[in-house]
Amino acid sequence: ALGVARRFAARTAIPTRVVALPRNVGGAGGFTAGIALAVEPLMQPLGPHTLGAGYRMGGYEPQPGLVHDMWLMDDDTVPLPNALEELLRASDACVAQNGRVPVALGSKAIWTDGREHLMNKPRPRTHPAEGGTKLRGLPSAYQTRSLSFVSCLLNADTIAAMRRLPKTAYFLWNDDYEYTTALLKRHIGYYVPASEVVHKTKVFGSSDADPGARFYNEVRNKIWLWRGSRGNFTRTERVLFLLKTVRRWALTWLRSPDRTVIADCLRRGWHD
């Protein structure tokens, strides 16, 4: 994969920097490193004179004007030609309608046969943040409470100001959920189905499809999220998170062809 990336960098006219990490830190570590490198040029020393017009009581709010965005994708994601264009179009629509730059925008993920990858489709936000629930001119887009890193446009200015990165220790799974729920607790984000990417997973399935031994990461990280990131959610959201997690784990257990593996993952994930 590193060789492919370097060959692409050598051939493309797009300025490209290939970064090789010294060890395997999983998807969570890779996204964290990428985000950190992207926001580094925007970082300023903390102080009363460096906060800028984007800061207000209760947090940082990105302002319309010069905007720095970063586009995150999984290594098995292939964007369709207009995927980025549609995300930027949604960003412009959000600014025009709400007077605010969206903190995060997510693409619609489809599988190799054209079916929508429902495991990457977020639910509409129950209690929308300030601004429109939907975007004028983009009727399929809607506000959401979380987004997937399969294809996600993040506002780099907000992240630099918040000094908040994903949690590398998650290694695999739920790092995007933990991070985007933190970003979107007080900020606006939209799911933009007009932006499409192909997510080339080995099998087509929902979030409760049998994950095998990787279910350990699901259990451990969800427990870590419950214990260490409860501030990401309101009280009602915490209750819903717990109920949905129990339901998902129960469906995973019922649908698994090897429940001994699932049971072992539950035991180890619970204790770790």
What feature does the model see in each segment?
Residues 147, 151-163, 169-195:
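A short, conserved alpha-helix in the catalytic core of glycosyltransferases
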Residues 21-62:
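Glycine-rich, basic loop-to-helix element that forms the pyrophosphate-binding segment
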Residues 192-209:
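Active-site donor/metal-binding and catalytic loop motifs
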Residues 1-19, 41-44:
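Acidic donor-binding segment of Leloir-type glycosyltransferases
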Residues 123-145:
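Short, flexible, basic/aromatic active-site loop/helix in glycosyltransferases
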Residues 70:
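Short aromatic/hydrophobic "clamp" motif used to bind/position activated sugar donors
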